[in-house]
């Protein structure tokens, strides 16, 4: 049975967008390292953000759905690329807002993520 995938992105566009997103997250983490103990590791299709050596935020590619998923100790989110931004299909929140809220919640520190840090 064929999956119903209404996302019009071509697979190469999807990978380009997610790779850019992962790079931007890494750059943002570098800028926040002075504020709190935060770093990240890239493993295949997964970016793991380590917070205060005790918590993690995990972001991974869901290629077959052309989505990115974000998992925290509090919740899980599925994002689709809509109108040039990643939007949660449940909460309708922008990816960057959810990422920032999740990191602040897990560290109790003011962490700022910017879509464009240049």
UniProtKB/Swiss-Prot annotation:
The keyword Transferase does not apply. It comes from the Bacteria. Keywords: Iron, Metal-binding. SUPFAM superfamilies: Frataxin/Nqo15-like (SSF55387). Pfam families: Frataxin_Cyay. GO terms for molecular function: ferric iron binding; ferrous iron binding. One of its GO terms (cellular component) is cytosol. GO terms for biological process: iron-sulfur cluster assembly. HAMAP family: CyaY. PANTHER family: FRATAXIN (PTHR16821), FRATAXIN, MITOCHONDRIAL (PTHR16821:SF2). Involved in iron-sulfur (Fe-S) cluster assembly. May act as a regulator of Fe-S biogenesis. Belongs to the frataxin family. This is Iron-sulfur cluster assembly protein CyaY. The gene is cyaY.
């Amino acid at each position: 049975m064929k999956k119903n995938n209404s996302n019009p992105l071509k697979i190469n566009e999807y990978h380009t967008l997610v790779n850019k997103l992962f790079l931007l997250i890494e750059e943002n983490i570098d800028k926040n390292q002075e504020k709190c103990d935060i770093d990240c590791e890239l493993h295949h299709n997964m970016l793991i953000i380590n917070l205060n050596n005790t918590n993690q935020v995990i972001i991974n590619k869901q290629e077959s759905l052309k989505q990115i998923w974000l998992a925290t100790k509090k919740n899980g989110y599925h994002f689709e690329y809509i109108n040039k931004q990643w939007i949660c299909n449940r909460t309708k929140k922008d990816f960057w807002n959810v990422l920032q809220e999740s990191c602040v919640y897990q560290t109790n520190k003011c962490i700022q993520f910017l879509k464009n840090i240049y």
